[in-house]
């Protein structure tokens, strides 16, 4: 029986923990997760998604504020004598002392095909950059940020209509199976770790608020990728008030092959032109069509300031938008 301690925090990490719990040859000794956070009305303390699963399975849970400087937690982890630590979206860097504790080391599941998109937000940046394929990589952790030797990979195609939430769900499903397979094969000595080539590395840094701002001078495809990559946070303005843009359709011939049948009528709007940021047409039942720096972009789903998400068509009717008005 392979003895594992799981480190993870958000919903993305939950399928990984569940896959370990369901494997007949793996024993999960306990879970390390981030401290409960105060949220919502009354500032209630809310446990992490991973902690909820751990409690449901009667697992021990440790929640150090700073694991590097928590001698009590470090002593507990040392005494567990785990074979391996499995780490997925934990949220803290692990010290060399922790990395060296388990017999087989610490294995991380990372949401990209390393060495591409090292860093905190690989799912979001792979979408923003317009990648058509991504995946999960398991690696042996070292002291660097996603620089450890690679173990196994699983590729996942990216659809033109995937947003960050959709892709996270896909990767969590494939990644959970990959992590369990990695741990079993590692224990059996069947994997040869492959060092990463630093010359091939690209980065996925922490997302900043300014990344959410839409610049209509950009092309339609670039804006579409930004909206789905940073979903549900991208912003413009409409009549001087903030407008969240949640879903778009690029009216660009190179995207036509990926249109579902329902989008076919939109192709007839491609000839429209106007000033950058201007509403050049309104597609019935869909929404406003905006002129970008290169091509047209339809706003399929939006969230006006102070309101719930709604279709672009509902916004057109609710605000009585007209051709010639400008956004941003």
From Swiss-Prot:
Enzyme superclass (EC): transferase
Transmembrane segments: none
Gene3D superfamilies xrefs: 3.40.50.12230
Reaction(s) catalysed (UniProt annotation): L-methionyl-tRNA(fMet) + (6R)-10-formyltetrahydrofolate = N-formyl-L-methionyl-tRNA(fMet) + (6S)-5,6,7,8-tetrahydrofolate + H(+)
Signal peptide stretch: none
CC annotations in GO: cytosol
Residues engaged in binding (6S)-5,6,7,8-tetrahydrofolate: 112-115
InterPro entries listed in its UniProt record: Fmt, Formyl_trans_C, Formyl_transf_N, Formyl_transf_N_sf, Formyl_transferase-like_C_sf, GART_AS, Met-tRNA-FMT_C, Met-tRNA-FMT_N
Pfam family of the protein (one): Formyl_trans_C
Enzyme Commission number, as recorded: 2.1.2.9
Family from the record: Belongs to the Fmt family.
Function of the protein: Attaches a formyl group to the free amino group of methionyl-tRNA(fMet). The formyl group appears to play a dual role in the initiator identity of N-formylmethionyl-tRNA by promoting its recognition by IF2 and preventing the misappropriation of this tRNA by the elongation apparatus.
Protein name: Methionyl-tRNA formyltransferase
Biological classification of the source: Bacteria, Bacillati, Cyanobacteriota, Cyanophyceae, Oscillatoriophycideae
């Amino acid at each position: 029986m392979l003895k594992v301690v799981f480190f993870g925090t958000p919903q993305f990490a939950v399928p990984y923990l569940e896959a370990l719990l369901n494997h007949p040859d793996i024993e999960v000794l306990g879970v390390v997760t981030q401290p409960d956070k105060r949220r919502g009305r009354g500032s209630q303390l809310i446990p992490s998604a991973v902690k909820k699963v751990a409690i449901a399975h009667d697992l021990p849970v440790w929640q150090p504020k700073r694991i590097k400087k928590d001698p009590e937690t470090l002593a507990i982890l040392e005494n567990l004598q785990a074979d391996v630590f499995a780490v997925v979206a934990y949220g803290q860097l692990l010290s060399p002392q922790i990395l060296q504790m388990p017999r087989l080391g610490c294995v991380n599941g990372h949401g990209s095909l390393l060495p591409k998109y090292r860093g905190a937000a690989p799912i979001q940046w792979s979408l923003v950059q317009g990648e058509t394929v991504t995946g999960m990589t398991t690696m042996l952790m070292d002291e660097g940020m996603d620089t450890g030797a690679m173990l196994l990979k699983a590729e996942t195609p990216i659809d033109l209509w995937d947003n960050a939430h959709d892709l996270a769900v896909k990767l969590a499903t494939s990644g959970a199976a990959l992590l369990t397979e990695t741990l079993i094969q590692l224990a059996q000595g069947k994997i040869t770790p492959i060092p990463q080539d630093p010359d091939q590395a690209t980065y996925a840094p922490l997302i900043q608020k300014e990344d959410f701002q839409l610049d209509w001078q950009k092309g339609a495809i670039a804006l579409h990728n930004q909206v789905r990559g940073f979903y549900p946070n991208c912003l413009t303005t409409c009549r001087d008030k903030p407008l969240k843009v949640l879903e778009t359709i690029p009216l660009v011939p190179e995207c036509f092959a990926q249109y579902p049948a329902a989008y076919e009528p939109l192709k007839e709007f491609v000839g429209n032109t106007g000033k950058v940021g201007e509403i050049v047409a309104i597609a019935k039942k869909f929404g406003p069509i905006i002129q970008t720096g290169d091509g047209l972009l339809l706003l399929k789903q939006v969230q006006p300031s102070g309101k719930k998400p709604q279709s672009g068509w509902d916004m057109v009717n609710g605000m009585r938008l007209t051709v010639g008005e400008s956004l941003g």
